[in-house]
């Protein structure tokens, strides 16, 4: 099992990060990708990856919520971070028109800039899209021939959106959203449509604690050690063997990020 989406820089992990990693190892997680969401957190993510070398890797990027912070200095910082072999993707980048913490045009500018950087550095992209699919694909598509690989993290969209992403060759990240019988019902029906070699799994910890976990942790905080629960649910929905799915998705992650 490999967790492709861990927000280990979150203050929710401030008091016990090492224990979180230890619990992940004990749960059978073979590695994890620490997400960078702005310049500072991308630096912190790389620092954490260095502390857990050969087990953790990181991304360097600016989440659409932080797109208004984009500057020439930001680009220079990401470029410098990406010199480390532990930085294996540019992102989390993309569009989020759900709440528009940054204006749409700021998001578009930062997204294009990061796609250009990923193409230049021959790195995969770790993508985010929420309520912006048409614009997202329109921007992304011309870059795809120049990109090493692309994964749309935490996919929660509709069938047409999944089919569109698959048609463009994207890999798909699935989280504990699949474990929510209310919000995740459509996703539960779609997950069998994802080709086995393009499926990746993630917790998005500390967010998205699987709703059907029993017992629930008192903190209600998600952790990478809960990834086996997501693997079990995805395997059940796809009719896959749990161990085979765990191995296949870990292989997919290592192949996509060049580990």
From Swiss-Prot:
SUPFAM superfamilies: Metallo-dependent hydrolases. One of its GO terms (molecular function) is magnesium ion binding. Gene3D superfamilies: Metal-dependent hydrolases (3.20.20.140). It is an enzyme of class 3 (hydrolase). The keyword Metal-binding applies. Its EC number is 3.1.11.-, 3.1.13.-. It is found in: Cytoplasm. InterPro entries: DNase_TatD-rel_CS, Exonuc_TatD, Metal_Hydrolase, TatD-like, TatD-type_Hydrolase. Pfam families: TatD_DNase. Its main location: cytoplasm. Its cofactor is Mg(2+). A divalent metal cation binds at residues 92, 128, 153. GO terms for cellular component: cytoplasm. The keyword Oxidoreductase does not apply. Keywords: Cytoplasm, Exonuclease, Hydrolase, Magnesium, Metal-binding, Nuclease. 3'-5' exonuclease that prefers single-stranded DNA and RNA. May play a role in the H(2)O(2)-induced DNA damage repair. Monomer. Belongs to the metallo-dependent hydrolases superfamily. TatD-type hydrolase family. TatD subfamily. This is 3'-5' ssDNA/RNA exonuclease TatD. It comes from Erwinia amylovora (strain ATCC 49946 / CCPPB 0273 / Ea273 / 27-3). The lineage of its organism: Bacteria, Pseudomonadati, Pseudomonadota, Gammaproteobacteria, Enterobacterales. The gene is tatD.
